[in-house]
Each structure stands twice: as C-alpha cells, then as structure tokens.
C-alpha cells in the first residue's frame, strides 16, 4: 500500500512541476525544451528529486539548467500550494540524459543497419 501511495505522490508532483515549468516560470534563460522525465519524493516527504531532460545546444542547456536551479524556491512554493502534503518537499533538480543516450544508441543501430545493407 505504501508503494502505491508513493507512486501516486511522485506522479502528482511530476505533473505539477511540469506544469509549473512550462506555464509559470517566465525566465528568459529557459529557452530550450525542458521535459520532466521522473520525480522521486522521499518517504518522509522532505525532498523531491526532479529529473529533467533538456533539448537544445549546450549553451541553451546550461542556461536552462541555471534558470531551473534558480527557480527551485518558486517551484517548491507552487508545489506546496497545488499538492496537499504533510510537508512540502525541497526540490532538487537533476539532469536526466537517458533520452539523449537512447537517441544516440538508436543512431548507432541505424548506421549499423545501413552499413549492413550497403555491404549486401
């Protein structure tokens, strides 16, 4: 039962953080496409690790990450207002590169497939 509750909390916080990032943060540095891939809230509801994937060039990624990290107080306040929890978790932003790694692996597999078809 506790795992089910934790999963619901994680999904609810993920949905709200995503909405906050896309609709409420007005930082001009947030120009790259930012996607919330996962959220892990600790059992005591003190911390919420928010995993984000940022698409764009390296400069845009760095600026977007800095914008997100400078907005953690605002994000925490909004999460506390929108999600009714005993404690409002402290938001920790982490970069998730799994989507980029997956795209790179897909490109490698595609190039291998092309090389095999050219050899035949």
Curated annotation (Swiss-Prot):
Name-wise, this protein is Ribosome-binding factor A
State its role. Answer: One of several proteins that assist in the late maturation steps of the functional core of the 30S ribosomal subunit. Associates with free 30S ribosomal subunits (but not with 30S subunits that are part of 70S ribosomes or polysomes). Required for efficient processing of 16S rRNA. May interact with the 5'-terminal helix region of 16S rRNA.
Alphabetical list of SUPFAM superfamilies matching this protein = Ribosome-binding factor A, RbfA
- Keywords assigned by UniProt, alphabetized: Cytoplasm, Ribosome biogenesis
**Does the record's keyword annotation contain Cytoplasm?**
yes
User: Which species expresses this protein natively?
Assistant: Clostridium botulinum (strain Langeland / NCTC 10281 / Type F)
GO-annotated molecular function: ribosomal small subunit binding
Please give an example of a GO cellular component term from this record. cytosol
């Amino acid at each position: 039962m506790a795992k089910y509750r934790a999963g619901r909390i994680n999904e609810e916080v993920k949905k709200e953080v995503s909405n906050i990032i896309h609709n409420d943060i007005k930082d001009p540095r947030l120009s790259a496409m930012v996607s919330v891939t996962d959220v892990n809230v600790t059992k005591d509801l003190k911390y919420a690790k928010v995993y984000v994937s940022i698409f764009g060039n390296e400069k845009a990624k760095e600026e977007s990450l800095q914008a997100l990290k400078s907005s953690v107080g605002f994000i925490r306040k909004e999460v506390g207002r929108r999600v009714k929890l005993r404690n409002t978790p402290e938001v920790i932003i982490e970069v998730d590169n799994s989507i980029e790694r997956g795209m790179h692996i897909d490109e490698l597999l595609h190039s291998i497939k092309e090389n095999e078809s050219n050899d035949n």
